Amino acid sequence: MNVLKLLCKYHVDINISSHSSGRTSLHYAVLFNHKRALSFLLARGADVFKKDACMCTPLYYAMLSDQRDMVTMLLHSKKYIVKFRNKLDLHNAIETGNIKVIKTLLDNGVNENSVDKDGLTPLHYAVKYGNISIVKMFVIR
């Protein structure tokens, strides 16, 4: 945290990315589960849309690692839809099968009827991956 504060004090660009990985300080805050750093960076306008060399956003990493608090923080920082490999966040979460992350996304306003580039909804993905629990969750909603 001290390093982040010092960098901001001297107006260093907090969105600068690593040459090799393309990751920003926001990516690393998520990857290392550092909520204070994430909050600090978001308050200073860190780019939540910035993708790394793998085309992953900080939100994608938060979903993959089941960091629901961070998912919520990122979603509340800006209302947005981010595509990763032509799929939307909710579609990606369904692929992982993590019901808690899926519920977190839905509870924070992610559109459950969104469609990917092929016109498939999250429910289509749940059926495609054979995840009965997720299918039931969508049918009950």
Swiss-Prot record:
<dbReference type="InterPro" id="IPR002110">
    <property type="entry name" value="Ankyrin_rpt"/>
</dbReference>
<feature type="repeat" description="ANK 4">
    <location>
        <begin position="118"/>
        <end position="140"/>
    </location>
</feature>
<feature type="repeat" description="ANK 1">
    <location>
        <begin position="21"/>
        <end position="50"/>
    </location>
</feature>
<dbReference type="Pfam" id="PF12796">
    <property type="entry name" value="Ank_2"/>
</dbReference>
<protein>
    <recommendedName>
        <fullName>Putative ankyrin repeat protein FPV223</fullName>
    </recommendedName>
</protein>
<keyword id="KW-0040">ANK repeat</keyword>
<dbReference type="InterPro" id="IPR036770">
    <property type="entry name" value="Ankyrin_rpt-contain_sf"/>
</dbReference>
<dbReference type="Pfam" id="PF13637">
    <property type="entry name" value="Ank_4"/>
</dbReference>
<feature type="repeat" description="ANK 3">
    <location>
        <begin position="85"/>
        <end position="114"/>
    </location>
</feature>
<feature type="repeat" description="ANK 2">
    <location>
        <begin position="54"/>
        <end position="83"/>
    </location>
</feature>
<keyword id="KW-0677">Repeat</keyword>
